[in-house]
Amino acid sequence: MTWSIVARDANGHFGVAVASKFFAVGALCPHAQSGVGALATQALVNPLLAAPALAGMAQQRVPAELLADLLAADSGSAHRQFHMVDALGRAAAHTGGECIDWCGHTMRDGFSVAGNMLAGPQVIEATADSYAAHAALPFAQRLLTALAAGEAAGGDKRGKQAAALLVFNGQDYPALDIRVDDHAEPILELQRLYDVSLQRFQPFVTCLPSREHPSGTTDRQQIEAQIERFHAARKAASQVGA
């Protein structure tokens, strides 16, 4: 019913992008924690796997061994699909034997793609190839571009309904948590919401209390100045890339 990508980028940030013919997929599937890892739990989803998986990665357990232990304790593991990446970029994935075709996963350096009820294996391969080919993009946009590539390759064979993007960039709260719960074109809508977030939300979040600056920025003129700097930097970057 779903395909997703979980990734750790070169800056140590974590992200999950997911799309599905399943209402509000972002409420149950994607999970991440700064400095720890990212994961997606899907197919006949078991949301109870997420917390112990993150806890195990926080203890620097080997992801494949951790996942094996989690699945051994779940009598429904044959119906689950689960994949994750840790702070060292190590990935682990499971596609249960009772998951509905097409289903499967691929793991590459620092990321994993997994899906079920898909049009075919080309969906996860296109998603993975796109992510690998677009390292120059901002992390969130790179994830969205990969998701769109999977959609173009066939996506969920039942159709479209929901999509989500979750990114942690080193703080105890997400840098982005965008969800499209029910839409005719969820990935396009997710991209639109991401574009809207660039206007003020993303630069504003950089002014919030953080690990480095526990009180954040409270002077509104300084906040507006930061927003202007953010857009100036984006404009300069686009001109360099043109």
Which role does the model predict for each range below?
Residues 1-242:
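N-terminal nucleophile
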